[in-house]
Design a protein with these regions (language model features):
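Conserved donor-binding/catalytic core segment of Leloir-type glycosyltransferases
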Residues: 1-16, 22-25
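Glycosyltransferase donor-sugar binding loop
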Residues: 9, 34-50, 66-67
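A charged, aromatic-enriched C-terminal amphipathic alpha-helix characteristic of glycosyltransferases
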Residues: 149-182
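Short alpha-helical donor nucleotide-sugar binding micro-motif in glycosyltransferases
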Residues: 75-80
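Nucleotide-activated donor-binding/catalytic signature segment of Leloir-type glycosyltransferases, i.e.
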Residues: 49-74
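Short hydrophobic beta-strand element within catalytic cores of glycosyltransferases
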Residues: 105-108, 112
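Aromatic "clamp/platform" in nucleotide-sugar-dependent glycosyltransferases that forms part
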Residues: 88
Length: 186
């Protein structure tokens, strides 16, 4: 199901790129974009909270839900048009895998870890340059998603392949093998 909105779920902090996303969404709307943006997650930083409070009063189509339950998060993933993940620093990127289970388009930053996790099966935007450059790159990504949204943007086979690499059993085996290798290197 597609209820026609961009979605971000995660901690509300700069390292997750939330400031870039809020600024990019403002610009996206100023440039004629119409798709709403829903933000969900625990507020972590005062400056993000202030930026968001201002944007909520000035930018049409922006909604902040705060922290949401697992059930609500599942529904949000299931009903979004596109998941936006603008992270500046990420250990793994579990939300991307969660969204892939719903076969939804994803627009993510071009962090190296995402190359390893999902390869090239998601849309990417550049983190190069200063904040203005990042905002422009993300706005362009959002506009490209708007153009492609109904044209089979998701490669379900590529998603399935990415998800198969990270089953709980496989991840558990990787952790076990790592711990064993560390124990053997003593």
């Amino acid at each position: 199901k597609d209820e026609n909105y961009f979605l971000y779920v995660g901690n509300m902090e700069k390292r997750k790129g939330v400031d870039i996303l809020i600024k990019a969404y403002r610009r996206y709307r100023e440039e004629g974009g119409t798709r709403p943006l829903i933000l969900a997650g625990k507020m972590q930083e005062d400056d993000i909270e202030q930026l968001l409070e201002t944007a909520l009063t000035e930018v049409e189509g922006l909604t902040y839900l705060g922290y949401v339950s697992h059930t609500t998060r599942y529904d949000l993933y299931n009903n979004c048009s596109c998941f936006v993940f603008p992270s500046m620093a990420e250990g793994f990127g579990m939300p991307i895998l969660e969204v892939m289970k719903h076969n939804k388009p994803i627009l993510a930053s071009n962090l190296k870890i995402f190359d390893e996790v999902v390869g090239d099966c998601v849309e990417r935007f550049s983190l190069a340059g200063d904040d203005d450059d990042k905002v422009i790159s993300l706005v362009n990504g959002m506009k490209n998603i708007d153009k492609k949204i109904n044209s089979g943007l998701v490669d379900e086979n590529a998603y399935r392949h990415a998800l198969d690499k990270y089953t709980p059993e496989r991840l558990g085996g990787m952790v076990r093998d790592f711990i064993n290798s560390q124990m053997n290197n003593r």
